Amino acid sequence: MPVPVRRARGFVPEPVPLDPGSDACILALGGQEKGTFTLTRGDAAFVSPHLGDLGDYRSQMNYRSELASFERMLSLSPDVVVRDMHPDYFTSRIAAVLGAGKVIEVQHHHAHAVSVMAEYGISGPVIGVSFDGTGFGGDGTLWGGEFLLARQHDFRRLAHLRHVPLPGGERAVREPWRMSLMYLLSLIHI
């Protein structure tokens, strides 16, 4: 049976099956780059198409339009909104205005671990490894290269790459050679 590598590259009407859990409709807004959202209903998670880099205004408008379409198509209105901890993300800024009674912040790399747990029906705990770029951490710094002991509702950071400056700011996320150079230079200055 083929396994989709990236379900959200196109319209995906078939839901990801979930273990029975909350009856609440949960809207997970995703991060800033490679934007997607997920709506849950009972034991099903409906993943949006890939909506682009949400730093771009057109992508933001498309994101809002797709979200409204999904809510109409599925007859869902979120009871809970889950957003990334990063305060400057588009998804973080719109979370409060989406009409849900409760907004929950989640650490970016913990969200990756939990999404894989949900997809495979694992309740945890697991060791989650995330090397996908930066994520706003609970200590107010940017995290990257995390090893987490993850459960569905919480996690403990077991290990991580050493903190080094981001050469070129957010460009370092899109141009990984910059971070490689910083780590090599940091070895010289031990």
Name each model feature, range by range:
Residues L39-G55, L74, H160:
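Gly-rich Lys/Arg/Thr-decorated short loops/hinges at beta-loop-alpha junctions or inter-strand turns
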Residues I26-A28, V82, V126-S130:
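Short glycine-aspartate micro-motif
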